[in-house]
Amino acid sequence: MNRMEKIFSGLKTEIEQQGLNVFGIVLYSSENEKYINLWSENKRRNIFSAAKTFVSIAIGICVDEGRLTLEDSILEFFPEYKPYASSGTEKITVRNLLQMASGKAIHRFPKDISDTDYALLFLRESLTTEPGTVFYYSNACSYMLGRVIEKVTGNTLCDYLIPRVFNKLGILNPEWSTCPQGHTIGATGLALTTEELARLGVLLMNGGSYNGQNIVSNGYIKSMTTDCICAKELHSEYPKSMADYGYHIWVNGERNIYWAWGKQGQYCIVVPWLNLVISVTARLEPDSNAILDTIMKLI
């Protein structure tokens, strides 16, 4: 039994012994070795905040295409809202949004608001810290990045990614939730199978390429997984991360591991030094780090 088989077997055993409500696990190696175990029907499910990493990939492609830079002020993309923006909002950059360091303590938008543009709500929210200095996990940051992409491409986030990423990964006709105004939510609401989620990890592990096609630059992937902000604590509704945060991706620099993470046990974990990708879809209630903790022990 090789190392990958041992990790797969150990993870499968731990999931079953702990009685975790896992839908499926997929392991890939760089040699296209693949192991799959499904406990339920192989269908697309909401990967929750693991979707955020696709937002980052979209930003990287926009950078590659010369449509924006990470140092651009997000307010410059919304000239119509400049008169309403709170003081200091002009300091918030694309990079700040990627690192969840906008300086605004707004996590998500109220569900009962349907007649006001979410972008306006974000821009007029007051700053609580200097942009770029303090991590504050925020679905609003991901949403705003999607709106920036719309501004520079003329397409919704989802539509922009279809020919550039989803089709190339074999993720056909993706479904991604929208806000009341019809803009891709970005932060959550993307439905994928466990294997489709794993393809994101293969793209990252290969430095921005998949099946020989370059999708996003290797330089962006390196920055995405190394340019981090300290993120040891999350909101009380989430388990502690014990990691730092790159460009919409969690990073454990000491272990040289990074991952996309959605609540209730959605993971796409990349272990570069093992040439290994592990994806998991689940519904863990209450939410916990049980799956990630198990994987950390096995590797």
Regions inferred by a protein language model and the residue ranges of each:
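A short, well-structured edge-of-sheet supersecondary motif
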Residues: 7-41, 268-269, 275-279
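Short, charged, amphipathic alpha-helices and their helix-cap/turn boundaries
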Residues: 29, 33-34, 75, 107-131, ...
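Flexible glycine/proline-enriched surface loops and loop-helix/loop-strand junctions
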Residues: 40, 126-130, 141-143, 179-185
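Active-site SXXK
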Residues: 46-71, 97, 145-149, 197-200
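Active-site helix/loop module of the DD-peptidase/beta-lactamase fold
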Residues: 65-100, 152-192
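Active-site-proximal alpha-helical segments within enzyme catalytic domains
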Residues: 144-148, 186-209, 266-281
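Active-site Gly/Thr loop motif
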Residues: 223-277
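Short, gly/Ser/Thr-rich active-site loops of penicillin-recognizing serine hydrolases
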Residues: 290-299
